[in-house]
Amino acid sequence: MVDPKRLRRRMVREQLEARGINDAEVLAAMSAVPRHLFVQEALRAQAYEDTPLPIGYGQTISQPYVVALMSQLLEVRRGMRVLEIGTGSGYQAAVLATMGCTVFTVERLRELYQDTGNLLRQLGLRGVHMQRRDGTLGMPEAAPFDRIIVTAGGPEVPRPLTDQLDEGGILLIPVGPRPRAQRLMRFRKEQGRMTGEDLGPAIFVDLVGDHGW
């Protein structure tokens, strides 16, 4: 495998900056996080290509551009508390933690919870707190959150998540009907009300749970 640092620099230049990702903190984090460690060993040669990859158990790691875009759309600042629904490979959580956020992340699949938890610990990402549970219920004991990011698509915005979003916060979630055809929505909470913005079409795995599919 070519030097991962060189591949990351090329990924940032050709896949992210060339497509409008201009948040310096996002670009720095994407340059630093070793994406090849978050994919299956047999697929590591493809880790820095702009494509999603299977991670087992019917799940995928999003393409680098999507991770960067969602990180930029969250408008995070260092020190923010971020709730992530759908840990998956752990790559998105690692990027946000590298940006200086405290990340609370939820995974429902036991195997991914174990595998990803082990990897995050090996990488020394102490700013990531992971639990296994129904993500559509959020993490009420750690609320409120400055930002909430949902990495799976559901039929509607789960009410527990809006309740756990702090005033002035942002919630980013794919919403729409099956099969995996959603709209990426960004909601802002102002004076207790949620105002939504349609950011365009999106394709994500299904959000499974009491308030999902």
Curated annotation (Swiss-Prot):
Record-annotated active site: S62
Output this protein's name.
Protein-L-isoaspartate O-methyltransferase
According to the UniProt entry, what is the EC number of this protein? 2.1.1.77
Keyword Cytoplasm carried by entry: yes
Entries under Pfam families matching the protein: PCMT
Subcellular location, record wording:
Cytoplasm
Q: Name one GO biological process term.
A: protein repair
Q: Which reaction does it catalyse?
A: [protein]-L-isoaspartate + S-adenosyl-L-methionine = [protein]-L-isoaspartate alpha-methyl ester + S-adenosyl-L-homocysteine
Q: What is its main location?
A: cytoplasm
Function per UniProt? Catalyzes the methyl esterification of L-isoaspartyl residues in peptides and proteins that result from spontaneous decomposition of normal L-aspartyl and L-asparaginyl residues. It plays a role in the repair and/or degradation of damaged proteins.
Q: Which Gene3D superfamilies match?
A: Vaccinia Virus protein VP39 (3.40.50.150)
Has keyword S-adenosyl-L-methionine? yes
The GO terms this record gives for MF are: protein-L-isoaspartate (D-aspartate) O-methyltransferase activity
Q: Which domain of life is it from?
A: Bacteria
GO-annotated cellular components: cytoplasm
In terms of HAMAP family, this protein maps to: PIMT (MF_00090)
Protein family per UniProt: Belongs to the methyltransferase superfamily. L-isoaspartyl/D-aspartyl protein methyltransferase family.
Q: Which InterPro entries match?
A: PCMT, SAM-dependent_MTases_sf
This protein's UniProt keywords: Cytoplasm, Methyltransferase, S-adenosyl-L-methionine, Transferase
The leader peptide range reads none
